[in-house]
Curated annotation (Swiss-Prot):
Outcome following mutation: residue 277 to E: In TGCT; somatic mutation
Function in brief: Serine/threonine-protein kinase involved in regulation of lymphocyte migration. Phosphorylates MSN, and possibly PLK1. Involved in regulation of lymphocyte migration by mediating phosphorylation of ERM proteins such as MSN. Acts as a negative regulator of MAP3K1/MEKK1. May also act as a cell cycle regulator by acting as a polo kinase kinase: mediates phosphorylation of PLK1 in vitro; however such data require additional evidences in vivo.
Keyword Membrane attached: yes
Encoding gene (name): STK10
GO biological process: intracellular signal transduction; lymphocyte aggregation; protein autophosphorylation; protein phosphorylation; regulation of lymphocyte migration
PTM statement from Swiss-Prot or TrEMBL: Autophosphorylates following homodimerization, leading to activation of the protein.
Organism of origin: Homo sapiens
Tissue: Highly expressed in rapidly proliferating tissues (spleen, placenta, and peripheral blood leukocytes). Also expressed in brain, heart, skeletal muscle, colon, thymus, kidney, liver, small intestine and lung.
Other facts: Inhibition by erlotinib, an orally administered EGFR tyrosine kinase inhibitor used for treatment, enhances STK10-dependent lymphocytic responses, possibly leading to the aggravation of skin inflammation observed upon treatment by erlotinib.
Name listed for the protein in its UniProt record: Serine/threonine-protein kinase 10
């Protein structure tokens, strides 16, 4: 069900799936086999094999990284690496020679580096790098990182395995498979990706918390870890599984060198400031280039010597140690050595120096110039591996009755470059150990001592004598971390007493209460390697000797298994990163589509209301125009009607005037004849004047009545139009209110919808994190089970070997004790032969009982060991389960906090939006009221303008004055 939900989260619709796209630096139209010829295999990476290829035309060599890609999405995962390689032209970064995608395989052709990776060189030479070599590598890595960071590129996987060497002594930074190319200078990343042992603390935190992203400073931390790795062959905490390493990095102090006294103050200070857990105070690559540790480096001679040594011709010589027949010689030599143990001073058990390893007296490291020029001297290098030939750990011969075993030195061999002083030191060491050498010792003068970790001895109880110390396994440092120890016992033998040397050679069996003989197979063979090479015209010869032991094979096996585990983890990280990228792309697409939809909805709503407003305004205009037309018609008709009435009134008025004239004539005719003429003339003049006055008054009165009637009609028309415009304004404002209310409602709905989408996306993101975390936990449990099974199998094998070895040891000890007992009886000379035979018989019976008791003790010890081992395995699983539960719980808590913070942020945004909504409503109402007041003011001004002069139009293009043309 969870997997189905996971697939649903990452599922995209059909139209969202990406089509095949062309990439600038990837060719699809060419088969790489037509251009390149595979001439060999270089290695097997986490995502594909790496081949050595040769250009068919130019003959140039390249490293071909061939990756099978099943889809375009997988192909896109590697495009970042190709783009980074194509855009980074730097002398210390590998160059891209071409990229091809053909037949479902991606071919990435990069520059071929014959020197190989630094970690492979260290394994080949079986030692870490010297400080001058580390300085040159560090300087060149810093220059490469400074260039990358200036291009806004984070490497994210710095380690010795990704630092390649050329024959010219320069490095090439490689493997940009998990690198990030930012778009902005201050951009940060939150992907949990990289190799755990080299991860910065801020990157580790991104496994469960994405709130603390990291930037290019993470590469500086990885650089510091890489320098420690080059000094000690292995990175810090390499003995832990990746799960514990992440916890260790996050909670512990920054790692340091195991033996700081061997290294310079500048190196230690450089590591201190580079391994700063606070990325804000951690320096950048440009700042570290000014550090005294690397600022004065101008020559790469140290790296040229390193590459020449790694690529030099090797002459190997395997020398056999004691064979089984030599055991009898060792038994015969017991009588000779017995005198030594009796005559010399009493030797206490080797617990006096049990807590002090051989590195207790390390040689002082020399300056870089001195160490480079002293190849042939035994202790000239801090690592002590370039030219050391020392005495091998002595083989333990059978001991005396007190249970003390006597050391028998192995053969000693002299290196090609040894001078006479080393021989004197060896002779002096033998002289200090005292006594005569046994014949077995005289026959083994060619073997040389191996590295301290290779000479670790095991007791029957599984305890180790590492570097000459009797320490329990929990306190003993891991083997690979001791590979850079001093020049073994050659430089320190003169200051060590006999008791210390003896403690190196003996194996203490605490439960049996006696010292047991070591397994002869442990020192069966010695491998001597002689390397001859030329640097700057000077021929250098370096001889190293190493005892081949089972521990060597175990170390190699553990290294291989750890690489396998890291490869599995890298695959999980890559898949997780791909899923995270797909989910992020899906979320971005969802947000983009949602924003587009929101914008479309808002635009559609605005368009709807704009259309309504346009329709309303158009209707208003049409209605007003129609009303104006009606009003004009009404004015003309009213003016015509009034004119007709006034004409009739004027006609009647004229008739009345005529009647008045007749009456005046009648009155004059009634006068006497002599007065008529004069009176007629006078009356007629008066009548004419009165007629004119009355006519003028009548016409003026008619005109005034007409204008008043027209004014009333115009006022009525204007009032009617004003009412209509008020009505339309109210409708328009109501429509505007509806428009804004709809937009506000949509905004609130969109806020809610966006919050729900972001919340669901956050849940999907954490669901994916939980899914990937559970997959990682399942892989970690699987690795832990394999580790526990290996430990149990190794314990069973060791117990089987001890069980098979015990009878041989008992027989050898029995012979020795019987011989010594017979010799003591012979010396004492007491009793008859029968009594001596009886004593020998009793002694033999006691020996049988003692041996039987030892076998029972061994069986009981093996049972206890197995029980403890099973308990330890169960404890490992329980601890792992607890750590995984804590991570899951932390992830759930963080998800809860993020969801809560998201809800609070949404509520706050909603509150702020509502708070801003009130002023918006108020501003809208004020704007609408202002428009209403402006309209009323316009109408009022129109009325006032019409009052003093009725003939003046109140509103242009809407109200027209009365004119004589209206009446016609």
């Amino acid at each position: 069900m969870a997997f189905a939900n996971f697939r649903r989260i990452l599922r995209l619709s059909t139209f969202e799936k990406r089509k095949s796209r062309e990439y600038e630096h990837v060719r699809r139209d060419l088969d790489p086999n037509e251009v390149w010829e595979i001439v060999g295999e270089l290695g097997d990476g986490a995502f594909g094999k790496v081949y050595k290829a040769k250009n068919k035309e130019t003959g140039a060599l390249a490293a071909a990284k061939v990756i099978e890609t099943k889809s375009e999405e997988e192909l896109e995962d590697y495009i970042v690496e190709i783009e980074i390689l194509a855009t980074c032209d730097h002398p210390y970064i590998v160059k891209l020679l071409g990229a091809y995608y053909h037949d479902g395989k991606l071919w990435i052709m990069i520059e071929f580096c014959p020197g190989g990776a630094v970690d492979a060189i260290m394994l080949e030479l079986d030692r870490g790098l010297t400080e001058p070599q580390i300085q040159v590598v560090c300087r060149q890595m810093l220059e490469a990182l400074n260039f990358l960071h200036s291009k806004r590129i984070i490497h994210r996987d710095l380690k010795a395995g990704n630092v390649l060497m050329t024959l010219e002594g320069d490095i090439r930074l490689a493997d940009f498979g998990v690198s990030a190319k930012n778009l902005k200078t201050l951009q940060k990343r939150d992907s949990f990706i990289g190799t755990p042992y080299w991860m910065a603390p801020e990157v580790v935190m991104c496994e469960t918390m994405k709130d603390t992203p990291y930037d290019y400073k993470a590469d500086i931390w990885s650089l510091g870890i890489t320098l420690i790795e080059m000094a000690q062959i292995e990175p810090p905490h390499h003995e832990l599984n990746p799960m514990r390493v992440l916890l260790k990095i996050a909670k512990s102090d920054p790692p340091t060198l195991l033996t700081p006294s061997k290294w310079s103050v500048e190196f230690r200070d450089f590591l201190k400031i580079a391994l700063d857990k606070n990325p804000e105070t951690r320096p950048s690559a440009a700042q570290l280039l000014e550090h005294p540790f690397v600022s004065s480096i101008t020559s790469n001679k140290a790296l040229r010597e390193l590459v020449a040594e790694a690529k030099a011709e090797v002459m190997e010589e395997i020398e056999d140690g004691r064979d089984e027949g030599e055991e009898e010689d060792a038994v015969d030599a017991a009588s000779t050595l017995e005198n030594h143990t009796q005559n010399s001073s009493e030797v206490s058990p080797p617990s006096l120096n049990a807590d002090k390893p051989l590195e207790e007296s390390p040689s002082t490291p020399l300056a870089p110039s001195q160490s480079q020029d002293s190849v042939n001297e035994p202790c000239s290098q801090p690592s002590g591996d370039r030219s050391l030939q020392t005495t091998s750990p002595p083989v333990v011969a059978p001991g005396n009755e007190n249970g003390l075993a006597v050391p028998v030195p192995l053969r000693k061999s002299r290196p090609v470059s040894m001078d006479a002083r080393i021989q004197v030191a060896q002779e002096k060491q033998v002289a200090e150990q005292g006594g005569d050498l046994s014949p077995a010792a005289n026959r083994s003068q060619k073997a040389s001592q191996s590295r301290p970790n290779s000479s670790a001895l095991e007791t029957l109880g599984g305890e180790k004598l590492a570097n000459g110390s009797l320490e329990p396994p929990a306190q003993a440092a891991p083997g690979p971390s001791k590979r850079d120890s001093d020049c073994s016992s050659l430089c320190t033998s003169e200051s060590m007493d006999y008791g210390t040397n003896l403690s190196t050679d003996l194996s203490l069996n605490k439960e049996m209460g006696s010292l047991s003989i070591k397994d002869p197979k442990l020192y069966k063979k010695t491998l001597k390697r002689t390397r001859k090479f030329v640097v700057d015209g000077v021929e250098v010869s370096i001889t190293t000797s190493k005892i081949i032991s089972e521990d060597e094979k175990k170390d190699e096996e553990m290294r291989f298994l750890r690489r396998q585990e890291l490869r599995e983890l890298r695959l999980l990280q890559k898949e997780e990163h791909r899923n995270q990228t797909q989910l992020s792309n899906k979320h971005e697409l969802q947000l983009e589509q949602m924003h587009k939809r929101f914008e479309q909805e808002i635009n559609a709503k605005k368009k709807f209301f704009d259309t309504e407003l346009e329709n309303l305004e158009r209707q208003q205009k049409q209605q007003v125009e129609k009303m104006e037309q009606d009003h004009a018609v009404r004015r003309r008709e009213e003016a015509r009607r009034i004119r007709l009435e006034q004409d009739r009134d004027y006609t009647r008025f004229q008739e009345q005037l005529k009647l008045m004239k007749k009456e005046v004539k009648n009155e004059v005719e009634k006068l006497p004849r002599q007065q008529r003429k004069e009176s007629m003339k006078q009356k007629m003049e008066e009548h004419t004047q009165k007629k004119q006055l009355l006519d003028r008054d009548f016409v003026a009165k008619q005109k005034e009545d007409l204008e008043l009637a027209m004014k009333r009609l115009t006022t009525d028309n204007r009032r009617e139009i004003c009412d209509k415009e008020r009505e339309c304004l109210m409708k328009k404002q109501e429509l505007l209110r509806d428009r804004e209310a709809a937009l506000w409602e949509m905004e609130e709905h969109q806020l809610q919808e966006r919050h729900q989408l972001v919340k669901q996306q956050l849940k999907d993101q954490y669901f994916l994190q939980r899914h990937e975390l559970l997959r990682k936990h399942e892989k970690e449990r699987e690795q832990m089970q394999r580790y526990n099974q290996r430990m149990i199998e190794q314990l069973k094998v060791r117990q089987q070997q001890e069980k098979a070895r015990l009878p041989k040891i008992q027989r050898s000890e029995g012979k020795t004790r019987m011989a010594m007992y017979k010799k003591s009886l012979h010396i004492n000379g007491g009793g008859s032969a029968a009594e001596q035979r009886e004593k020998i018989k009793q002694f033999s019976q006691q020996e049988e009982k003692r041996q039987k008791s030892e076998r029972l003790q061994q069986q009981q010890k093996h049972e206890n060991q197995m029980r403890d081992m099973l308990a330890q395995c169960e404890s490992n699983m329980s601890e792992l389960q607890q750590l995984q539960n804590e991570k899951c719980h932390l992830l759930v808590e963080h998800e809860t906090q993020k969801l809560k913070a998201l809800d609070e942020s949404h509520n706050q945004n909603l509150k702020e939006w509502r708070d801003k909504l009130r002023p918006r409503k108020k501003a809208l109402e004020e704007d609408l009221n202002q428009k209403k007041r402006e309209q009323e003011m316009f109408f009022k001004l129109s009325e006032e303008a019409e009052c003093p002069n009725p003939s003046t139009p109140s509103k242009a293009a809407k109200f027209f004055p009365y004119s004589s043309a209206d009446a016609s």
